[in-house]
Amino acid sequence: MKCEHCTRKECSKKSKTDDQENVSSDGAQPSDGASPAKESEEKGEFHKLADAKIFLSDCLACDSCVTVEEGVQLSQQSAKDFLHVLNLNKRCDTSKHRVLVVSVCPQSLPYFAAKFNLSVTDASRRLCGFLKSLGVHYVFDTTIAADFSILESQKEFVRRYHQHSEEQRELPMLTSACPGWVRYAERVLGRPIIPYLCTAKSPQQVMGSLVKDYFARQQNLSPEKIFHVVVAPCYDKKLEALREGLSTTLNGARGTDCVLTSGEIAQIMEQSDLSVKDIAVDTLFGDMKEVAVQRHDGVSSDGHLAHVFRHAAKELFGEHVEEITYRALRNKDFHEVTLEKNGEVLLRFAAAYGFRNIQNMIQKLKKGKLPYHFVEVLACPRGCLNGRGQAQTEDGHTDRALLQQMEGIYSGIPVRPPESSTHVQELYQEWLEGTESPKVQEVLHTSYQSLEPCTDGLDIKW
């Protein structure tokens, strides 16, 4: 099976499959009402291929990038594997028990709030209560991990801005928190694009280090004793968890053992007959007081653009930006933000969501015509809330009504700047030995490389 946006050149001459012929013969149109010609034009080289039951915003798991080994590991990134560990804890000797930790992405909470018709706070408590009724020991919110990711991105952008020149091109800085986009950059775009990727680790990667390193030491546990599960909106996070080096902690342990989508967790909840008591989400610091659900200033993501923009405006130009105005350009998934003074544009940032916009952005970047200092890049149109692990119908299309409801819920969550977290500042000192220490670079940053397409592939269908 191929991804519907497969970019392998040899695929472009392949004939349509029977399924495609059937679609053409019965005259069915795409769900958004666009004509086939228009759809083809919009996708450009991201041509539609055979039997597209898997989407690029789910993963890039066509046979050009997923190896057999990765395929076997992906089969373990499932609810079955999660429940297997829970059942082993119930049957085996206590000395062999594993401590189960579940970390929930903030973009997953609106899904549960919408699905169960609850406020986002009540949905958080219900989810936590359910997971603990299954046998999970701790449930964390990944917002604190996003704090670190954003703060390190802010510092990196300012450094790049100062170092940028015609001889040493450091800009634009492209975000790297979206694993679908990063995998595409490494597997397809390669060396011309890799240097522009932000080296700050994604929230999932940082959370893995927090759980398997900091939290493990606080609890006097070896990292191997912890089974860490992340609940996320999209399938790409599963591939991110498998990436060697990218998601491995200082002690050599894999930061995330299993990734489950919001939809997979909801399915477990629906199939369970457990009596659930609402419980507040845990904190890494053992606080007894319940922490309110908060988010960063992103439209439907972790908010790297907004927070880096404000920080850069202040650090580079002494300008305090309160309200950010997003100006839609090509379409609703491509926005521009500028900082202007006396008619001069000082900073020009952009958000490019969805691979149609990413393709256009990359073409301009390769030609040296991309005017931006910073681009927030996400594989999913409309951002992380539209992850295929929570916002799609059974036939694989976006559930627009659900997505709109989730966007409304998410926008109502209070915004907290990462700089305001006292816990983060404490962790910089206690865990990382200072904000500019070598350990910060080692724990919170990574590197990317151009990866040759794999010849040993495996077709994946989720």
Curated annotation (Swiss-Prot):
Q: Where is the composition biased (Basic and acidic residues)?
A: 1-19
Where in the cell?
A: Nucleus
SUPFAM superfamilies for this protein:
Fe-only hydrogenase (SSF53920)
Q: Which InterPro entries match?
A: Cytosolic_Fe-S_CAF (IPR050340), Fe_hydrogenase (IPR009016), Fe_hydrogenase_lsu_C (IPR004108), Fe_hydrogenase_ssu (IPR003149)
Per the record, residues carrying Phosphoserine are: 35
- What is the first-listed, main subcellular location in coarse terms? nucleus
The protein's UniProt keywords, in alphabetical order, are: Nucleus, Phosphoprotein
Q: Which residues form a coiled coil?
A: none
Please indicate if the UniProt record lists Iron as a keyword.
no
Q: Which family does it belong to?
A: Belongs to the NARF family.
Name of the protein described by the UniProt record? Nuclear prelamin A recognition factor
Look up and give the organism this protein is from: Mus musculus
